[in-house]
A protein has these predicted regions:
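Outer membrane beta-barrel transmembrane domains
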Residues: 35, 77-82, 202-301
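Hydrophobic, lipid-facing positions within transmembrane beta-strands of outer-membrane proteins
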Residues: 47-53, 95-99, 116, 156-162, ...
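Outer-membrane pore/translocation modules
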Residues: 71-213, 234-252, 279
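Histidine/cysteine-enriched polar flanking segments
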Residues: 35, 39-48, 71, 93, ...
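Bacterial Sec-dependent N-terminal signal peptides
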Residues: 1-24, 301
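N-terminal ordered "arm"
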Residues: 22-60, 64
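Short glycine/proline-enriched turns and hinge-like loops at secondary-structure junctions
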Residues: 42-43, 112, 174, 287-290
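Transmembrane beta-strands of outer-membrane beta-barrel proteins
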Residues: 23-27, 63-69, 114-120, 160, ...
Length: 301
């Protein structure tokens, strides 16, 4: 778990309609310190890190296996408050550490793909989130988070997700896709619809993330994209668990959440680097909007 560190990178930029199958590795970091407004917030979903790889499985180059080690951290809206000062209506402290295994299938025309992911992990002190955030804050000279003694302990968990993305417009510079997904599991249960808009002279229509394939480009290649996401929340055990006492839930979750994501990606030969900004509407009634950034890198092997 000591390998988790707040560093960078998410990847991108697919290429021609016929892509060489390849193996790749990536590192992806998310943090609200990377807020586009210029000031870190350290609240709600405050940091995440993923280290993983993707490997093509057969000669037709249409199926891929992905595997990643991930960690996510959540804190209250004010990390300098002591445990006894925290409001039950604020976001709870929580850490998730988990292993994800995915299976990705493209159709022959490269106009659609389907992805299935299973994640197995743990929460609470065994996630290592408290230790890692405190050490990172000491290294960068930031405030020490004081509320980790109240972190949620939900035990081990399992999450499953199925996602389907289809291209509806692929004309020269402009690409438009639609993504639908459902996530079910011990903690998060939701349904998502998200159109994708991409400006890119490349023939590949999709937004290329670190868990997507990319093809090697001889010349530097730039891609700009936007992804508004609409989410129906069925359940969120992070917000619907009262860590202080039993009884009714202290927070009223919002059933509909909106997230806007905007990214820019640069690919140089077999290396892809991406910078992304996310903005979320409040997840529960007493919450406020939240912004965080993401930086990632993928390398073809």
């Amino acid at each position: 778990m000591k390998l988790f560190c707040c560093l960078a990178i998410i990847s991108l930029i697919p290429k021609p309609v016929k892509l060489m199958g390849q193996n790749s590795v990536y590192i992806d970091a998310q943090n609200d310190f990377l807020n586009y407004k210029g000031a870190g917030t350290d609240k709600y979903f405050t940091a995440g890190i993923s280290l993983g790889g993707m490997f093509h499985l057969n000669k037709n180059e249409s199926t891929y296996l992905s595997i990643a080690l991930n960690q996510k951290m959540y804190t209250s809206s004010n990390i300098i408050l002591d445990s006894e000062e925290l409001s039950p209506l604020d976001y709870p402290y929580a850490g998730l550490t988990y292993l994800s295994i995915g299976y990705l299938v493209f159709n022959k025309k490269n106009t659609a793909y389907t992805k299935a992911v299973v994640s197995l992990g743990t929460t609470g002190p065994s996630s290592g989130a408290k230790m890692i955030q405190r050490k990172l804050h000491r290294i960068i000279g930031d405030r020490e988070p004081k509320g980790w003694s109240t972190q949620l302990e939900l035990g081990n968990f399992v999450q499953t997700q199925i996602e389907h993305t289809r291209s509806y417009l692929n004309k020269h510079w402009v690409k438009i896709n639609m993504t639908s997904s459902i996530e079910l599991g011990s903690i998060f249960n939701n349904i998502t619809l998200a159109p994708e808009f991409k400006l890119d002279k490349n023939k590949d229509p999709f937004i290329g993330f670190y868990n997507k394939r990319i093809s090697t480009n001889k010349k530097p290649h730039l891609s700009i994209w936007a992804k508004p996401k609409f989410q129906l929340i069925i359940a969120n055990c992070l917000l619907q668990t009262n860590q202080n006492s039993s009884g009714c839930f202290p927070r009223t979750i919002n059933k509909f959440i909106y997230q806007s994501s905007v990214g820019i990606s640069l690919q140089i030969k077999n290396l892809s680097i991406s910078l992304i900004q996310h903005n979320n509407t409040p997840e529960f009634k007493t919450a406020t909007p939240h912004a965080f950034g993401e930086i990632a890198m993928q390398l073809n092997l």
